[in-house]
Regions:
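Core dinuclear metal-dependent hydrolase active-site scaffold
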Residues: 1-33, 84-146, 160, 210
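Binuclear metal-ion centers of metallo-dependent hydrolases, dominated by the metallo-beta-lactamase
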Residues: 5-6, 77-92, 143, 166, ...
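Divalent metal-coordination and catalytic microenvironments
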Residues: 15, 42, 49, 99, ...
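Short, Asp-centered acidic motifs that coordinate Mg2+ and/or phosphate
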Residues: 20-21, 37, 149, 176
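Active-site metal-binding motif and surrounding structural segment of the metallo-beta-lactamase
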Residues: 26-72, 146-151
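Short, acidic/turn-prone active-site loops that include or flank metal/cofactor-
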Residues: 27-28, 44-45, 68-70, 87-91, ...
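Portal/gating segments that form or line small-molecule/metal binding sites
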Residues: 53-107, 119-121, 193-196
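Metallo-beta-lactamase
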Residues: 122-175, 179-188
């Protein structure tokens, strides 16, 4: 399930399966310019980075973005026909890839307000459902997620900490859980280790971050 899936840093994820997909490209080390689809969860600099998008975009790359980012992409000069704006809690399909948006927001801090309608994504590839949570706390919406693989923030401060993330994973019970959002801006490598330690034995915790 995790073949050809990388956590490049922070919450920057690359999936190379039927298509090459980036989620929140950030601190990309060189020009790859190979993205079929780029998913953006919200507009904070460590998730929406135009500098890093330029390193992965190619002719015809499809953007999946929250509505509020549309103006920024158009000002940057990206083709409107290549952009799909999404709402939280909806299902979509692009380039043969099915995906669903899950609201991503804070419940006890002010960094990611619910009313902004920022999102995480459940992306289905070859029948496997990958949940990329975005910047979120435990919410009523993500407690109902059904997925096979979950990539969730564990670093705290702006999102769930490792204890909260483990509690969410133990509730939704994916087969595999991968920690993100630690070790670069907030959170430590120990947070990832402690997250895995707290998982139910039936759930496989794996660190993918380089």
């Amino acid at each position: 399930m995790l073949d050809n899936i990388e956590v490049l840093c922070h919450s920057s994820i690359r999936i190379n399966k039927e298509k090459i997909i980036y989620i929140d490209p950030f601190k990309i080390d060189k020009n790859y310019n190979d993205a079929d689809v780029i998913f953006i969860t919200h507009d904070h600099y460590d998730h929406y980075s135009e500098e890093d998008i330029d390193k992965v975009i190619k002719e015809g790359t499809t953007f999946i973005i929250p509505e509020e980012l549309l103006t920024k992409l158009l000002v940057k000069g990206y083709n409107k026909n290549d952009i799909i704006t999404v709402e939280a809690g909806k299902q979509y399909i692009t380039q043969g890839i099915k995906f669903k948006t899950i609201p991503a927001y804070n419940t006890n801090k002010a960094f990611h307000p619910k009313e902004n309608e920022w999102v995480g994504y459940i992306i289905e590839i070859k029948g496997i459902r990958y949940y990329i949570a975005g910047d979120t706390d435990i919410t009523e919406e993500n407690k109902k997620v059904k997925c096979d693989v979950a990539l969730v923030p564990v670093g705290g401060t702006y999102t769930m900490d490792f204890k909260e993330a483990a509690r969410l994973i133990n509730e939704i019970k994916p087969q595999i859980a991968v920690p993100t959002h630690y070790g670069d801006i907030v959170g430590t490598n120990q947070d990832a280790t402690d997250f895995i330690r707290l998982l139910h034995p039936i759930i496989k915790g794996i660190i993918l971050k380089k």
